[in-house]
Amino acid sequence: MKIYFIVGLLFMAMVAIMAAPVEDEFEPLEHFENEERADRHRRVTCDLLSFKGQVNDSACAANCLSLGKAGGHCEKGVCICRKTSFKDLWDKRFG
């Protein structure tokens, strides 16, 4: 039983050593020469997620809530978030 425990520890130590990152690997990744702006696709929640009209505005509203807005709706396939934040709406109703 002791031999299995020792072999297991040696195996785990070998795996940990092999999985450790090498410092030289990260040097080229840290220097970005030319950063490009990422494209924003506002139609994903309204077009792709509302397949055959099953999700509709709820995916857009959930996306807007995750952005800190008070909800949203789909308008011609584009997700339109409310201007007010969720905190402002909460304070207006309950605060």
Swiss-Prot record:
Removed propeptide positions: 20-43
GO BP terms in the entry: defense response to bacterium; humoral immune response; innate immune response
Ribonucleoprotein in keyword set: no
PANTHER family associated with the record: DEFENSIN (PTHR13645:SF0)
Annotated signal peptide: 1-19
Family the UniProt entry places it in: Belongs to the invertebrate defensin family. Type 1 subfamily.
Keywords: Amidation, Antibiotic, Antimicrobial, Cleavage on pair of basic residues, Defensin, Disulfide bond, Immunity, Innate immunity, Secreted, Signal
Disulfide linkage: C46-C74, C60-C79, C64-C81
Lineage: Eukaryota, Metazoa, Ecdysozoa, Arthropoda, Hexapoda
Organism of this sequence: Apis mellifera (Honeybee)
Distribution of this protein across tissues and organs: High expression in head, hypopharyngeal gland, and mandibular gland. Low expression in thorax and thoracic salivary gland.
Listed name of the protein: Defensin-1
CC terms in the record's Gene Ontology section: extracellular space
Modified residues (Phenylalanine amide): F94
Task performed by this protein: Found in royal jelly and in hemolymph, potent antibacterial protein against Gram-positive bacteria at low concentration.
Database matches in SUPFAM superfamilies: Scorpion toxin-like (SSF57095)
UniProt cross-references to Pfam families, sorted A to Z: Defensin_2
UniProt entry tagged with the keyword Transmembrane helix: no
Main location: secreted
Compartments, record wording: Secreted
UniProt xrefs under InterPro entries: Defensin_insect (IPR017982), Defensin_invertebrate/fungal (IPR001542), Scorpion_toxin-like (IPR003614), Scorpion_toxin-like_sf (IPR036574)
Top-rank lineage group of the source organism: Eukaryota
PROSITE patterns xrefs: INVERT_DEFENSINS
